[in-house]
Amino acid sequence: MARISGVEIPNEKRVVISLTYIYGIGLSTSQKVLSKLNISEDVRTRDLTEEQIKAISTEISNFKVEGELRREVSLNIKRLMEIGCYRGLRHRKGLPVRGQSSKTNARTVKGPRKTVANKKK
């Protein structure tokens, strides 16, 4: 397995798909990187030469990926929470941030139901 940006990318998959295993690199970014380096998207990762792997690594080092990107995202969320804006309050309460209804759904964000016992008559 080739190691790029601290991530083991799978050998058996096409390079364009293998690069998406790196956090912060999606399909379009991996296509741009490969076209810039004149590497075919259909080549398997195991068939890449050392020079091609190094070229891909140096090209990807220009992007924010993995730990650096995760850190930036978490700092952005912390900043929203500190300034007390609406999005920050929603993050703090563990509710949907982007305007979704939360009366009935939103179970993914809210977590499992906290069941309340019925009043006896």
UniProtKB/Swiss-Prot annotation:
Q: Which InterPro entries match?
A: Rbsml_uS13_C (IPR027437), Ribosomal_uS13 (IPR001892), Ribosomal_uS13-like_H2TH (IPR010979), Ribosomal_uS13_bac-type (IPR019980), Ribosomal_uS13_CS (IPR018269)
**PROSITE patterns annotated for this entry?**
RIBOSOMAL_S13_1, RIBOSOMAL_S13_2
Q: Which UniProt keywords apply?
A: Ribonucleoprotein, Ribosomal protein, RNA-binding, rRNA-binding, tRNA-binding
Q: Which PANTHER family does the entry link to?
A: 30S RIBOSOMAL PROTEIN S13/40S RIBOSOMAL PROTEIN S18, SMALL RIBOSOMAL SUBUNIT PROTEIN US13M
GO process terms (BP): translation
Assembly and partners?
A: Part of the 30S ribosomal subunit. Forms a loose heterodimer with protein S19. Forms two bridges to the 50S subunit in the 70S ribosome.
Q: List compositional bias (Basic residues) regions by residue number.
A: 110-121
Name of this chain's protein: Small ribosomal subunit protein uS13
Q: Which gene encodes it?
A: rpsM
Q: Which organism is it from?
A: Mesoplasma florum (strain ATCC 33453 / NBRC 100688 / NCTC 11704 / L1) (Acholeplasma florum)
